C-alpha cells in the first residue's frame, strides 16, 4: 500500500469512528455502569459478544475455560490482526460519570479507576473500522477482537497465552486511556501472583 492509499484508509477509518462515536460512547457508559470485577464481567462480556454477533463477527465465548473471555473473528486470510479489549473494574471505586469529586453510584461499590470501560469500547471501535475497510476493499485480512477479562489481577492473558490463542496472529494491538497520546514500544515483565504461607517458629 502506497502512502496515498494508506492516508486514505486512515482517514476513512477515522471518519467511520467519528460518524459512529455515539455508539461507542454508549458502550463505554454501559460498561462504566456495570463496573464488574475481574473474571466476573458477565454483563460486559455479554454486551460485547452481542454487538460483535450483530455485526457479522464469528464469536467464540468461554475460551480457555474463562467464562468472560471471548474472541470475535471477521474476514479471512492474512494478515491476522488481533485487537485486545479489557473491561474489568476495581472494588471501592464506584463513581458517577462526569463528577470531579467523590460521588459513588453505590457506596463502597465497584468502579472503573483505570478506564477499562473506554479501553474495551475503543478497541471495539478500531475492530469495527477495520471490518469496514475489509468489506469495502475486499482485501485479504482477518481482524480478531479479544475479550481479555481480569486484567487487574493479571489473569486471563496468561491463560490465553498458555492455550496458544495468540499463535495465529501476525500482530496484536491494544491501547490504554491516559493523559497523553503516545506509542509504547518497549517490553515489560510477565506478572505472576504467588501466595506464600510460612509455618513454624520465627
List PLM regions with ranges.
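Acidic/His- and Gly-rich active-site-bordering loop/insert found
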Residues: 3-112, 117-141
Amino acid at each position: 500500500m502506497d502512502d496515498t492509499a494508506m492516508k486514505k484508509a486512515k482517514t476513512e477509518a477515522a471518519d467511520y469512528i467519528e460518524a459512529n462515536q455515539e455508539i461507542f460512547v454508549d458502550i463505554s457508559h454501559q460498561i462504566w455502569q456495570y463496573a464488574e470485577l475481574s473474571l466476573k464481567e458477565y454483563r460486559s462480556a455479554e454486551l460485547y459478544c452481542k454487538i460483535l454477533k450483530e455485526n457479522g463477527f464469528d464469536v467464540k465465548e468461554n475460551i480457555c475455560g474463562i467464562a468472560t473471555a471471548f474472541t470475535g473473528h471477521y474476514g479471512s486470510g492474512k494478515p491476522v490482526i488481533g485487537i485486545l479489549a479489557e473491561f474489568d473494574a476495581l472494588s471501592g471505586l464506584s463513581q458517577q460519570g462526569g463528577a470531579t469529586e467523590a460521588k459513588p453510584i453505590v457506596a463502597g461499590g465497584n468502579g472503573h479507576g483505570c478506564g477499562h470501560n473506554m479501553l474495551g469500547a475503543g478497541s471495539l471501535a478500531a475492530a469495527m473500522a477495520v471490518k469496514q475497510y475489509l468489506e469495502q476493499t475486499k482485501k485479504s485480512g482477518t481482524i480478531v477482537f479479544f475479550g481479555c477479562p481480569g486484567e487487574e489481577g493479571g489473569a486471563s492473558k496468561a491463560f490465553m497465552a498458555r492455550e496458544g490463542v495468540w499463535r495465529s496472529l501476525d500482530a496484536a494491538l491494544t491501547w490504554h486511556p491516559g493523559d497523553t497520546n503516545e506509542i509504547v514500544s518497549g517490553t515489560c515483565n510477565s506478572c505472576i501472583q504467588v501466595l506464600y504461607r510460612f509455618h513454624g517458629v520465627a
